[in-house]
Amino acid sequence: MEKLFIPKGYKPLLSLRETEVAIKELKDFFEDSLAKNLNLTRVSAPLFVNKGSGLNDDLNGIERPVSFDMKAMPEFNIQIVHSLAKWKRLALHRYEFEHGEGLYTDMNAIRRDEDLDNIHSIYVDQWDWEKIIDKEERNLETLKETVKSIYGTFKATEDFIVAKYPHIEKILPEDITFITSQELEDRYPDLTSKERETAICKEFGAVFIIGIGGKLASGEKHDDRSPDYDDWTLNGDLLFYYPLFDEAVELSSMGIRVDEESLLKQLKIAECEERKELPFHQMLLEGKLPYTIGGGIGQSRICMFFLRKAHIGEVQASMWDEDMIRTCEENNIHLL
C-alpha cells in the first residue's frame, strides 16, 4: 500500500465516541483471552533501554531509534524501544519463569522512520509476549500449535465484537492456513512478496507464512528480520485478508527464538558478528537464557481490522502530515 488509500464510498460503522468505547472493550477481551490461551502473566515493560545493552530491536537494521541522554546518567545513550523482542527473553530469566509459562507486556514504541499510510504509524502499540519452551520443542509443530491458539483468540474476539455490534459482519475463516515463504514464491513466482501475501490471503482468508528473514531460491528474501531474535526457519507472519482494502494485512509477527547455533549463523549471514560482544548476546551464547517462542500483536491493527476502519489513525492518536489529515477528513476518515 502506497501512502494513503481511500476505500470507495467509505463510511465508518461506529461514531468517534462509539469507537473509543469499542477499542477499550476489544483490547480488554483480546488481552484476557490471549493470556489464558498461552498461559501468560502481564509484566511491566520499559519505554526505553540503554543502547549498550543490546536489548533494543534493530528491526531491519536501518531504522533509527529515538535516542536521548539524561542528566542523572550522562554517559548512557538511551533509546526508545522499537519492540521488546530481546528484553522479554531476558525478563523470563530474571523473573524465574518455568517451562510452559510466559509473559506479555502492553508495549508502546516509537518508530521514527516508518513510512506513513493507512496501516503504518510512528506510534506502535502491541502486546509483546514470550513463553519458555524446551530445546526439543524448537520445531514447526510447536510453532503451528501456538499460532492455532493465537488464531483462536482472534476468532473469539471477532465473535465478541459481532455480538456487541451486529452491523459488523464476520469475515475470518474457521481455520488458519499455513504455507512456507518458499512455497509461496513457488506458487506465485511472478509476484512481489507483498502481492503474494494478498493473493494467498484472498484465497484462504487467514494465513501464517513460515520462514521469514533468510533468502529464498530466487535469491530474494520474503522480508527482512533482525538476526538476533527469531530463528528465520521457525518464524512467520500472521496475515488476514481485509476486504476494505482488497489486500492482506499483517496482524502479528512471531517465532521460535534463536538458540546458540542459529544466532551465530544468522549474525554471520547478516554481517553483524560484532553483536556477539553485547551483554544480551553473551548471555544467550553462554546458555544462560531460556529457549523461547514469542511475538508481537498489533493493538491498533487489531482494532482497525475488527472495527472495519480505513485508517489506523481512527483507532490511535499519532502524527500525520497535513495532506493526509485533509484528505482523510474529506473522505469520512476521522483521525483521533
Swiss-Prot record:
This is Aspartate--ammonia ligase. Belongs to the class-II aminoacyl-tRNA synthetase family. AsnA subfamily. Its main location: cytoplasm. GO terms for cellular component: cytosol. It comes from Clostridium perfringens (strain 13 / Type A). Pathway: Amino-acid biosynthesis; L-asparagine biosynthesis; L-asparagine from L-aspartate (ammonia route): step 1/1. One of its GO terms (biological process) is L-asparagine biosynthetic process. The keyword Cytoplasm applies. It catalyses: L-aspartate + NH4(+) + ATP = L-asparagine + AMP + diphosphate + H(+). Keywords: Amino-acid biosynthesis, Asparagine biosynthesis, ATP-binding, Cytoplasm, Ligase, Nucleotide-binding. GO terms for molecular function: aspartate-ammonia ligase activity; ATP binding; catalytic activity, acting on a protein; transferase activity.
